[in-house]
């Protein structure tokens, strides 16, 4: 029995050592990088628009507890066919959240005609059973970003002295694949700190194990 116990302890120690070794092979950089967090309630539209959007969702019985509003527009839409009806069109673009974290590149767009729901673009998430804990450190994330920039971006050298920002959330690995099931993984979104939407380039996404999902410099996306 003692031999079995000792064998189990040795196996655990070996597994732990291997895990640490794998984690240590990731590039690290101790330069500037900050972690940011955008709660679902920190909308990027004015408070007046938030009230308007809340009313639209409420009046049309659309659940909005996991939606962060980042764009709102209103205009007159006229159909291209007789009788050429005109509608008061309101469009709301949102980020989706689950477990309090953003799902990257999983946005939705809602269109309302005369305050009534007209159509939705994008797939509604089914959520995830994954927790909100992460493994990667900020120096590792900065190291990964700089390594990706060096590999894919001709302007890589200018980012060596640039401060970065990192956001933890989830990513659907089947993004862009029609009719494919949603496969959410823990992920990080890395961009220059002073970049502002919609010009947050370059932007890189990594799984929480350090595997690159995509690197986009605004001209070309690399995976």
Describe the residue ranges of each PLM region:
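Sec-dependent signal peptide recognition
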Residues: 2-10
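C-terminal motif of bacterial Sec signal peptides marking the signal peptidase cleavage site
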Residues: 14-17
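Short, conserved catalytic or interaction motifs in soluble domains
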Residues: 20
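Segments that shape or occlude catalytic/ligand-binding pockets
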Residues: 23-223
């Amino acid at each position: 029995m003692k031999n079995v116990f000792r064998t189990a302890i040795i196996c655990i120690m070996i597994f732990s050592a291997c895990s640490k070794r794998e984690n240590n092979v990731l590039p690290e950089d101790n330069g500037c990088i900050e972690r940011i967090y955008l709660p679902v309630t920190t909308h990027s539209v004015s408070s007046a628009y938030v009230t308007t959007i809340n009313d639209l969702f409420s009046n049309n019985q659309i659940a909005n507890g996991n939606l962060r509003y980042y764009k709102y527009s209103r205009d007159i839409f006229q159909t291209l066919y007789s009788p050429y009806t005109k509608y008061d069109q309101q469009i709301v673009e949102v980020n989706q959240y689950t477990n309090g974290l953003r799902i990257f590149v999983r946005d939705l767009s809602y269109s309302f005609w005369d305050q009534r729901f007209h159509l939705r673009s994008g797939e509604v998430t089914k959520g995830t059973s994954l927790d909100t804990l992460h493994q990667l450190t900020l120096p590792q994330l900065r190291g990964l970003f700089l390594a990706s920039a060096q590999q894919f971006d001709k302007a890589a050298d200018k980012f060596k002295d640039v401060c970065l920002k990192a956001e933890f959330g989830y990513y659907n690995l089947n993004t862009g694949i029609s009719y494919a099931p949603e496969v959410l993984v823990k992920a990080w979104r890395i961009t220059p700190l002073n970049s502002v939407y919609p010009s947050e380039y370059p932007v890189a996404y990594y799984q929480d194990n350090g595997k690159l999902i995509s690197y986009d410099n605004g001209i070309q996306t690399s995976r």
